[in-house]
């Protein structure tokens, strides 16, 4: 929608759109910053933010408390400890043209009241496509590494950051007592390609691009996995410092290099707008010759005193801007359209392309979004691509922008063959032959086959064993497909319970898994160990693993907190499926309690009811609950707990559960947990790589136990 259309909005229409934009931008912030799974390109995201800002400028009285204009990043994950930034980690405003850069320079001059005759030095450097990280050093030693998070509170990933060779553990030379160094964690393209080969050999999902690989590698719960990935780090700024050690941005970079950091060698000091634009185009031409991905150029006022005077607006500094590169495009032929079936039955069209290189990457597949997109219809029913549909055999324009899967953005109509026929989206599921229906108001067509659909069944098992669900190492995509498709009843896995009975079935079998291609004695033993380690699991993870529609990680935690234990949740869900015919759902106490939980509501409630109405789902659950135990969200029996009232500290990497899970479990059993040792600490649980806390515990006389002793203690 263009600016003149915004000016035609009524106040009611503007308020409605601002509400939608707030929700949509927040959703994409979470997908990008927390889940490392963006759905839209940087350009599309920036367009949403620009539209939000333009409507707010026209209707300032309608600015919402949750306006995206005031937000940075996304809420942090609950998998990591929180780390509060002493100075906010702000994002940058974007420029998309030379005119935007010129306006930035003019704004800076106006704010500082600098005449045109006075030189204004700017530093320019490539904008690395990675994950922002803040490193805090005290007395020259690294004490904390934190992700950006929401800009104010990030995730503590110190153990993982220590495995990156570009990050010094101890600073060199003369340095401030306290200094926060900020920069970008990234992965070189060659290392990214090698990692994906390794992922595929292990039957695991490949990463979409180096940025996602870097982010996923840094945010591992096991630092040994991070250490196995070849991550790099460029320093580009400072946060809190105890003393001023430079007068300019370039001077700061030179000092950071002396301290032992890696600085991007392409950084340059520039004295005019013309030079800035020339530098931008020069790097744009050279970007594919670099060993790492960049998505623009960052300009900063060089003088640090001027930076202080310029200060900040709500979510970005006035003294810096990111000049983004345009999305990269190429022309190729659409050879076919494949339909993929997801775990919820969604039919997703994927374009099969004649191989084409876009942005240094060979592209053979691209997103087609949904049925309407192929027909030339937008999300609000408006025509897109001038109403042209997409047909097999068309010459198409493919765009690769930032972190998202490549997408077809247009066709070359004049190259279309006269014989090309319109694509007919299937009304039957390609995996099981069941009807595929499209509900009113939805863009997605879904298979109605449910649990008889093999494609859905495989995807549901993959979801069940995924990292944020049961997190069973050794059950990647290839392994799940193998176990699902094999005919031997002692090896097959068709339901979650089958995972946990596999070892028992194998003990009575003449066909041994160790002798199957791709397996061996060691890998099978590790698989059984990984499975058995998950026989007790937090309630929130259990609920998420069930794959109930709309019950993602966040809603699973909400439900776990509300019901505390699985029996209470299941009882409520079953009661909610039986509304009183006279008064309807509103008269059903269980339904009202369920849908009144913050963030749940009728849509999620209906999905839960639909899940529990299905007899087969209840049978699958019954079998699963014979094998696993969902742990109560909060123990009501702490009085007899051997750790009730004790102060416990965890250090190092635990192998049977994450440190966050161990802390939550300790607290449910009545203990208090802390991140630091003191004379009041009763117990230190030391995993692999406990480090300095072990020494300090001995000095303080604190009892130290390993993970096995910890498990024996709590199982008691």
From Swiss-Prot:
<keyword id="KW-0227">DNA damage</keyword>
<dbReference type="InterPro" id="IPR013840">
    <property type="entry name" value="DNAligase_N"/>
</dbReference>
<feature type="binding site">
    <location>
        <position position="184"/>
    </location>
    <ligand>
        <name>NAD(+)</name>
    </ligand>
</feature>
<feature type="binding site">
    <location>
        <position position="148"/>
    </location>
    <ligand>
        <name>NAD(+)</name>
    </ligand>
</feature>
<dbReference type="InterPro" id="IPR001357">
    <property type="entry name" value="BRCT_dom"/>
</dbReference>
<dbReference type="Pfam" id="PF03120">
    <property type="entry name" value="DNA_ligase_OB"/>
</dbReference>
<keyword id="KW-0460">Magnesium</keyword>
<dbReference type="InterPro" id="IPR013839">
    <property type="entry name" value="DNAligase_adenylation"/>
</dbReference>
<dbReference type="InterPro" id="IPR036420">
    <property type="entry name" value="BRCT_dom_sf"/>
</dbReference>
<dbReference type="InterPro" id="IPR004150">
    <property type="entry name" value="NAD_DNA_ligase_OB"/>
</dbReference>
<dbReference type="InterPro" id="IPR012340">
    <property type="entry name" value="NA-bd_OB-fold"/>
</dbReference>
<dbReference type="InterPro" id="IPR033136">
    <property type="entry name" value="DNA_ligase_CS"/>
</dbReference>
<feature type="binding site">
    <location>
        <begin position="91"/>
        <end position="92"/>
    </location>
    <ligand>
        <name>NAD(+)</name>
    </ligand>
</feature>
<dbReference type="GO" id="GO:0003911">
    <property type="term" value="F:DNA ligase (NAD+) activity"/>
</dbReference>
<dbReference type="GO" id="GO:0005829">
    <property type="term" value="C:cytosol"/>
</dbReference>
<feature type="binding site">
    <location>
        <begin position="42"/>
        <end position="46"/>
    </location>
    <ligand>
        <name>NAD(+)</name>
    </ligand>
</feature>
<keyword id="KW-0235">DNA replication</keyword>
<comment type="similarity">
    <text>Belongs to the NAD-dependent DNA ligase family. LigA subfamily.</text>
</comment>
<dbReference type="GO" id="GO:0046872">
    <property type="term" value="F:metal ion binding"/>
</dbReference>
<dbReference type="InterPro" id="IPR010994">
    <property type="entry name" value="RuvA_2-like"/>
</dbReference>
<keyword id="KW-0464">Manganese</keyword>
<dbReference type="InterPro" id="IPR004149">
    <property type="entry name" value="Znf_DNAligase_C4"/>
</dbReference>
<feature type="active site" description="N6-AMP-lysine intermediate">
    <location>
        <position position="127"/>
    </location>
</feature>
<dbReference type="InterPro" id="IPR041663">
    <property type="entry name" value="DisA/LigA_HHH"/>
</dbReference>
<keyword id="KW-0436">Ligase</keyword>
<feature type="binding site">
    <location>
        <position position="432"/>
    </location>
    <ligand>
        <name>Zn(2+)</name>
    </ligand>
</feature>
<dbReference type="GO" id="GO:0006281">
    <property type="term" value="P:DNA repair"/>
</dbReference>
<protein>
    <recommendedName>
        <fullName>DNA ligase</fullName>
        <ecNumber>6.5.1.2</ecNumber>
    </recommendedName>
</protein>
<feature type="binding site">
    <location>
        <position position="429"/>
    </location>
    <ligand>
        <name>Zn(2+)</name>
    </ligand>
</feature>
<feature type="binding site">
    <location>
        <position position="447"/>
    </location>
    <ligand>
        <name>Zn(2+)</name>
    </ligand>
</feature>
<dbReference type="InterPro" id="IPR001679">
    <property type="entry name" value="DNA_ligase"/>
</dbReference>
<dbReference type="Pfam" id="PF00533">
    <property type="entry name" value="BRCT"/>
</dbReference>
<keyword id="KW-0862">Zinc</keyword>
<keyword id="KW-0234">DNA repair</keyword>
<dbReference type="InterPro" id="IPR018239">
    <property type="entry name" value="DNA_ligase_AS"/>
</dbReference>
<feature type="binding site">
    <location>
        <position position="125"/>
    </location>
    <ligand>
        <name>NAD(+)</name>
    </ligand>
</feature>
<feature type="binding site">
    <location>
        <position position="324"/>
    </location>
    <ligand>
        <name>NAD(+)</name>
    </ligand>
</feature>
<keyword id="KW-0479">Metal-binding</keyword>
<dbReference type="Pfam" id="PF12826">
    <property type="entry name" value="HHH_2"/>
</dbReference>
<feature type="domain" description="BRCT">
    <location>
        <begin position="638"/>
        <end position="716"/>
    </location>
</feature>
<dbReference type="Pfam" id="PF01653">
    <property type="entry name" value="DNA_ligase_aden"/>
</dbReference>
<comment type="function">
    <text>DNA ligase that catalyzes the formation of phosphodiester linkages between 5'-phosphoryl and 3'-hydroxyl groups in double-stranded DNA using NAD as a coenzyme and as the energy source for the reaction. It is essential for DNA replication and repair of damaged DNA.</text>
</comment>
